[in-house]
Amino acid sequence: NENIMERFSLVLLIDPEHADIFDCFKENVNVDIRVYDGNNKIKLALYEMRLIWFGGVKYCYALELNKIGKLFKKKGIFWIPDFQHRTLPEFFGAEELAHKEKNDLAMTGSDNPMVLSSFDAARDLERFYPGHRCSVEVVHFVSYIEPEVRAITPELEQSVREKFDLKRNYIYIPNQFWQHKNHIVMVEAIECLLKEGRLCDYDFVFTGNLKDYRNPEYIDKLRKIMESDTVCANIKLLGFVERTEQLAIMKNAQFIVQPSLCEGWGTVLEDAKVLDKVVLLSNIPVHQEQQNKKCVLFDPHDPKQLAETIARTAARASLPEHEAEYAGNMEQGIANMYREAREYSRA
């Protein structure tokens, strides 16, 4: 937003793990990027206090109401990514549920501004905290990944194919393995397909670490299906993958599957939009709000329906007349990303 950039400078406090995401802003005179040591909490707290007290900071986003945050509450703009602990409480332990509820009650009980990433989240706020005092702004976001996707050269694509042994057509499932990401419906759909002898010449590619500290028994259930004789030859578990490599994998997939049960505003879908990819998308309300014309909705609780949707989409992708549609037009995707970013910043 040009009006904001003329009036304010931004100081971004970033942990080292995510610092490279913001490299593209280093040349912007209005953006000051500061990487902190996330392992030293005391040092970070002192740095934050010094920055806010003496650095002329007017607003703090997204402020957390911890001991430091409470000192600067008047400057705070809050953000709650989603209300998963309310919609899917069975995925959380009692201690974590209590902690999240305490934080959300403190934020929603304040008259500070509250940013939410979707109108679906705004409806949840009204449903779960009808007496809230915060002033709400819904601000959608895009994936600003133009530098990363432009770094995907034919040479990089070839090296990624060789590194991860991606010789066959494949379908990509990019999420981390939290239970709410709902990989179980995907692996059960794969099992249905392969038992019937369909898509045996396809690979199903997963990235992210096969862990969920909240629900280890869920991971055991996933692992049992993935390692079964029926599906193991067609499943590739790549683990944690570097960001540009991940985008190269997405770019060259036949299509993407996103079966999640809860999202605030899905980054996977925004990435896929920039690459102009076809996405099979769970039909949860936020996805219905976020989808574009290249999305196909399915019931996230019905593996047989998903299996049929995958088979039908794969058949369409194999037809020469649809080759360009499934390859994706990255230039068009980048243009759409900028258009949407302008629209969101004016909202």
Residue ranges of model-derived segments:
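Carbohydrate transferase catalytic cores enriched for Leloir-type hexosyltransferases
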Residues: 1-347
